[in-house]
From Swiss-Prot:
Gene: pyrC
GO biological process: 'de novo' UMP biosynthetic process; purine nucleobase catabolic process
EC class (word): hydrolase
Protein name per its UniProtKB record: Dihydroorotase
Function as written in the Swiss-Prot or TrEMBL entry: Catalyzes the reversible cyclization of carbamoyl aspartate to dihydroorotate.
Enzyme Commission no: 3.5.2.3
Amino acid sequence: MILIKNGRVMDPKSQRDQVADVLIDGKQIVKIASAIECQEAQVIDASGLIVAPGLVDIHVHFREPGQTHKEDIHTGALAAAAGGVTTVVMMANTNPVISDVETLQEVLASAAKEKIHIYTNASVTQAFNGKDVTDFKALLEAGAVSFSDDGIPLESSKVLKEAFDLANANQTFISLHEEDPQLNGVLGFNEGIAEEHFHFCGATGVAEYSMIARDVMIAYDRQAHVHIQHLSKAESVQVVAFAQQLGAKVTAEVSPQHFSTTEDLLLTAGTSAKMNPPLRTQRDRLAVIEGLKSGVITVIATDHAPHHKDEKAVDDMTKAPSGMTGLETSLSLGLTHLVEPGHLTLMSLLEKMTLNPALLYGFDAGYLAENGPADLVIFADKQERLITENFASKASNSPFIGNKLKGVVKYTIADGEVVYPN
């Protein structure tokens, strides 16, 4: 048993926000009250700390199978726990791609060994070929939670329409990475800084928002649920809002890097700041924050994308892989760039990092209640920390190394067990 004493208990589902004690027995919260005594429990003094549901991150890359020099499911789980994250959804762009039941079962068997809750998407198309839709029914029955070809866009509208119909028939949804390659230049560099500093055509805004426009309208026609991943452009927020007003079933996520910083970071952080979609302009950054405030964007998800340091340390930045490690900085970036400046309340930030992503997938997570799951994070919301290369992840490709950020995770509890510090 674990007894958490005197913490500020914040639950986005009930909107509870009060200093209270929380008693955990086994994998459940058994009591939340102003004062609880329990002689046999391990006591955690949470005085002055926030006690919240464990974070739910629905967009991570754990690189297993096939790319375990970058990350694996075990180190990914450790990184999640260090960041206060107790539930994750992995993407299918592994090697081999999670397109068939056999690969899916191998991945889930590895995930089951970890102490946090690890789910995975399967791919929309066979080995990401963009043509042949996978067997949604068989993959769902084998444990996939939804479908995405994340990492690359789905170019064929005909295939997308077929996939939406299949998703509807199987009561699931599709998540999409929106960057039209026919309208894009070099990926990972926003068009402005690409032209001005690097003298080539970069990743354009129109490649993102035109593809979102196409896909939300096909979803509208098919009455299918589409989830837009890591949108980064001001116009993208407006397109999603328009589709939602029409009555389309559209949800959207933003990654912490896109509300925290801009394209200029490429000049100082180098390849660590190279990602798809790229860091954009200040106008775009403020627009995605407005999207979070208005409710157009309901989910914050990291797109945790670890890479080996040698892969990022190339002389030609265009040859470096895109992506950054994000699980261990996401809460701090939200506290520093959304709560501290007054864009979101702490409760609203927590809602977008816990309850909303859990509701999207139907997970029993993202809330604190008696008889509910004992998945919690305990953190100091105002305490500052210096971001260093010492991550639990195998990777250290973060453009935020050297930054002072608010928010220090003190304990992460998953299934009633302290998983951080471990």
